[in-house]
Every structure is written in structure tokens, then in C-alpha cells.
From Swiss-Prot:
Any Pfam family hit: HlyE
Family note: Belongs to the hemolysin E family.
InterPro entries (UniProt xref): Hemolysin_E (IPR027018)
Protein name in UniProt: Putative hemolysin E-like protein
GO biological process: hemolysis in another organism
Superkingdom as given in the UniProt entry: Bacteria
UniProt source species: Escherichia coli O6:H1 (strain CFT073 / ATCC 700928 / UPEC)
């Protein structure tokens, strides 16, 4: 019976050490995951910022095209009123 108790004690000591090591490994994994989640958050923020600037540039380009077209149309109308050739011939619709 004494040998069985020693065997049980040995088993539980080994099991306890295994559980302690597992807890350490789990804590280390949690720390790594927390670090990775933070890194992903930074990437997400940078992506959103970049997307904003891309959208902003697209908007600015669109507004620039509209302004340029208005300027060309205004110049063409001015030149037509004064009998000069327009910058770009615009087909009448």
C-alpha cells in the first residue's frame, strides 16, 4: 500500500508540474496574442487613414476635373462671344 501511495504521489506531483507548465505556456500565449491584437489594431488604423487619403485624393481629383471643365467652358463661351476659336470644340447635342 505504501508503494501505491508513493506511485499516486509521484503521479500527482508530475501532473501538478505539467499543469504549472501549461499555465505558464498559456500566460505566454495570452501575452503574445495581446501583442498581436495591438499590432493588428495599429495596422487597422493605418489602413483606415490611408483609405481616407485615397478617397480624399479621388475627391480632390474629381473636384479639380470639374473646376477645369468649368474654366474651359467659360473660356470657350468667352471666345465664342468674341468670334475666336474655342480651346476645345464641344459638339452641340
Amino acid at each position: 500500500m505504501k508503494n501505491k501511495l508513493k506511485s499516486a504521489l509521484s503521479f500527482f506531483t508530475t501532473l501538478s508540474n505539467t499543469v504549472k507548465q501549461a499555465n505558464k505556456d498559456i500566460d505566454a500565449a495570452k501575452l503574445k496574442l495581446t501583442t498581436e491584437i495591438a499590432a493588428i489594431g495599429v495596422i487597422k488604423t493605418e489602413t483606415e487613414t490611408t483609405r481616407f487619403y485615397v478617397d480624399y485624393d479621388d475627391l480632390m481629383l474629381s473636384l479639380l476635373k470639374e473646376a477645369a471643365q468649368k474654366m474651359i467652358n467659360t473660356c470657350n463661351e468667352y471666345q465664342k462671344r468674341h468670334g475666336k476659336k474655342t480651346l476645345f470644340e464641344i459638339p452641340e447635342v
